Amino acid sequence: MWNGIIPGLVLVAMITAVAFSAHNVSGFALFSPMILAVVAGMVYSNVLGTPAHAKAGIAFSQKRLLRFAIVLLGFQLTLGQVVSIGAGGVGIVAATLGATFVFTITLGRLIGVDRKLAQLIAAGTSICGASAIVATNIVTDARDEDVTYAVASITLFGTVAMLGFPLLAPALGLDQHAFGLWAGASIHEVAQVIGAGFQNGTQSGEIATVAKLTRVTMLAPMVIALGLMARRKTSGGQQAARPPMPWFVAAFVAVVALNSLVTVPAEVKSAMALATTIMLTMGLAAMGLQADISQLRSRGLRPLALAFCAFLFIGCFSLVLVKFV
């Protein structure tokens, strides 16, 4: 088995190394290594072609490594973090997440966006960007091109939010607490939330980070819900063999609980965070290696329009809640 996957793992690791190196270059620091890995993988695949002998290792990275990375993500979360923003903050985050997800799925159906792609865009917008798209795709089983399209669109509008929202704070009359809650409840990627939050002050950055991590804790119930939806959508009315709660979701919940009950040394948490980022980056590099640009073009602009509308909705909906609730 290992001999068969080594060539693909080496290729994925090389692209991952390029992504991390590029992330440290001025001008690219705005983008996470995960996003850069998708782009690098696509460029490699569509310019040079993906070798046949690397397919097994690429598939291993895309499936098993990604699942394990989602589990390790639990070491970055505790229930205490959720409690720290208060019941009102948790309510705003939960309401924004649920409303955005339903809005995006509904609008996607109305404008003719493929159901699976709409679900990926909905998850990426409402929860935590690329990580949510990856986790969601394990139960939706969309095409690699759909995953790449969703990641690209979420990255685009998340970057717009990261750069633009801090500039709007004074005009909207938001203090540091309110802005942090708004940024954490609405901006797509964790790194983008941190970037936007700390532009407005330390308190704002800390609240934004906690609010965002609260959204991440809702990844597990969202994946379970999508798993149940996928079972109902199977042909002939028969249930799919895939369980409604994948093993990695149960493991993710268990790790969050463990991290909440047991004091994990800071050095261990730091190592786990790095390992999580590396494995997520490898998984997205693998997806980029299997993405066909011609297939992306065939999707047209409707999914991009859907992502834009979802971006506007989550920003406006959460702002109203922060200002008036």
Curated annotation (Swiss-Prot):
Membrane-crossing residue ranges in chain numbering: 5-22, 26-48, 65-87, 91-113, 120-142, 147-169, 213-230, 245-264, 271-293, 303-322
Name under which the protein is recorded: UPF0324 membrane protein mlr2225
Cysteines engaged in disulfide bonds, as pairs: none
Alphabetical UniProt keywords: Cell membrane, Membrane, Transmembrane, Transmembrane helix
GO CC annotations on file: plasma membrane
Membrane topology: Multi-pass membrane protein
One Pfam family named in its UniProt record: Cons_hypoth698
Subcellular compartments: Cell membrane
Family: Belongs to the UPF0324 family.
Lineage: superkingdom: Bacteria
